[in-house]
Curated annotation (Swiss-Prot):
EC number: 2.3.1.274
PANTHER family in UniProt: FATTY ACID/PHOSPHOLIPID SYNTHESIS PROTEIN PLSX, PHOSPHATE ACYLTRANSFERASE
Function in brief: Catalyzes the reversible formation of acyl-phosphate (acyl-PO(4)) from acyl-[acyl-carrier-protein] (acyl-ACP). This enzyme utilizes acyl-ACP as fatty acyl donor, but not acyl-CoA.
Gene Ontology CC, one term: cytoplasm
Protein's name in the database: Phosphate acyltransferase
Species of origin: Cupriavidus metallidurans (strain ATCC 43123 / DSM 2839 / NBRC 102507 / CH34)
Subunit structure: Homodimer. Probably interacts with PlsY.
Family membership: Belongs to the PlsX family.
Amino acid sequence: MTIKLAIDCMGGDHGVSVTVPAAISFLSSHDDAEMILVGLPDAIGAQLKKLHATDHPRVTVVPATEVITMDDPVEVALRKKKDSSMRVAATQVKEGKADACISAGNTGALMAVSRYVLKTLEGIERPAIATTIPNEQGWGTTVLDLGANADCEPGHLLQFARMADAMVSVVDHKEHPTVGLLNIGEEVIKGNEVVKAAGELLRASELNFYGNVEGNDIFKGTTDIVVCDGFVGNVALKSTEGLAKMIGSMIKEEFTRSWFTKLLAVVAMPVLSRLARRLDPARYNGASLLGLRGLVIKSHGSADAHSFEWAIKRGYDAARNGVIERIARAFAHKSGAGGAATGSPETDAPNPHPDSRAA
């Protein structure tokens, strides 16, 4: 089975200088992958020449004449830049030419463009952004939503949980993964009305619901999945990133304070190296836009080639394991957010493959 990946080569802070080398490097370790490099042909070609990959048999260059910058508002991305590398890459997925799209571009634009081009799966009202955050268990906690939906209804949180359950089941090979609802306490009576109502829906659902969890449970690995609205999730994610940078900076500062601490650093290097590998942010790069009729992976905008390659791997793994089909089946007999609250059945099974109706 060949996995074809459409790369938005112009997205992110570094564009082709990161995306193209990452794509070529990924091909060297994955014989069943093909790359569709989307963007300005001259810029992509120059990078391929540097990498001696101009005639790579598993690389196709698809031209796009426009670039969505990190500062472009959503309306510009949607209405004015219709031939952007981001949009063309998403269209490759819609037309069945690619199995997944990976972009380091503007998050808001990517969500808007992807939703416009691919549409949502039937039964899903709102797509959500999900990623994995490292935990003490070593396998990471899947957290969503991370910013796509600042305000949610209880049924939306139930839908997010179902989408994450489907993804974790096939990608991480965990049958019946545990689901936690992010709250200000474990007690059922804690939280605002939306969270309390969402808890009732989750307890009544077919999911393996653990109950309410707190922020520290994300890092303890108390549950496989943690669900929250996009406002809370984005704050949690940015706080995590900030804390990680601060701790790294403080450790470096302390170990370089004097000749003695530098000597200690040499002695502690094996331990520090193992810790660095466990907490390497590059390994967790790549957030999945769940709920669409095609796979879209969002890389961190400041990612280097090593980090972007991990985002490519996330798209590859999701495509290889049939995440879209699994989510579609999970919602085949479920309704939208309102129906999810009442448990009414959905009459039409979702179509996991984009077609002319998703134009």
